[in-house]
Amino acid sequence: MSGPGGANDIIARTVQRVIQQRKLVDAPLAIVSKVGAGGVLGWSYLNQHAGDGGYISISPINLLTEHILGASPLTYTDVTPIAQLFNEYVAFVVRADSPLRSGRDILDKLRSDSGALSFAVAASLGGANHIAAVLAMKNAGIDVKKLKFVVFTSGVQSQTAVMGGHVDVAAVPVSGVVPQVEAGRLRVLAVSSAQRLGGAFASVPTWKEQGVGSVFSSWRGVIGPKGMSAPQVAYWENVMARVVESDDWKKDIATNFWESNFMTSAESRKFLQAQYAEYKSVLIEVGLAR
């Protein structure tokens, strides 16, 4: 789903490391990177091995959004959901000397003029960071069709644009902003989680605390190819349950400010169905989907 060093690659290697260290499967695990087309190449490769329990993949929200946007013929109903692993939240950051001091300041500015501020998002409209911003503003009663978004290829570029004064606000994964926040170059005005995060974000209020009933996570799960048998699904479901119970995994969860949110295969399917409907509604509202 992503190249070496990308978010999904890192997650896949973390899962691989825990499985191998704890000897949770009998055979060695190999990472195969299939990069491009927003994840479509990876899911297509997965389905070339239909019914084969030897192939699994990390699944990000792109599995849903690329289909909603019309960029992918495949979605969660075309593969086999195995488990959900964790939630990753989005931080809304500004330059350290920005006159915007809170999430409420963002909302007040946009309520008077929906196009008054520019938002940096990566890596595409319709992606996790974009949806997080749209949902928060929508729930605050702001006309999301008039919001200004500037798309960058990475969260690092989004942060650089904010620090350079080229964009007012960046919506970025929380784990990626810690270095610039601790260096005093960026301030976090809100996070998209239901409750406050710890560590560097302990003093940062959620959108809910600032009067906006918006919670959003860029989750990660595990899928297999279409046509997997019930025993194959149960096997990998059990492996993933043991992964998330390990101390190594819990350490990675804490380090990256992720929130463990394990779901079984059946629970994952229901979750993905609900998420698909929510994302489709949002993307239709901003004119990116029908």
Regions found by a protein language model. Give the residues of each.
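C-terminal lobe and pocket-closing loops
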Residues: 176-247, 274-277
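Sec/Tat-exported extracytoplasmic proteins
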Residues: 19, 23, 33, 50, ...
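Ligand-binding pocket segment of bilobal, Venus flytrap-like solute-binding proteins
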Residues: 35, 116, 121-124, 128-203
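Short coil/turn segments
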Residues: 3-5, 61, 95-100, 122-127, ...
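An extracytoplasmic/periplasmic, membrane-proximal ligand-sensing/linker region
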Residues: 230-290
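Stable alpha-helical elements in mature extracytoplasmic
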Residues: 7-11, 15, 38-42, 61, ...
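Hinge/capping helix and adjacent helix->loop/strand transition within the periplasmic-binding protein
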Residues: 21, 45-54, 67-157, 207, ...
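N-terminal (or domain-start) structured segment
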Residues: 1-78, 125, 142-168, 262-263, ...
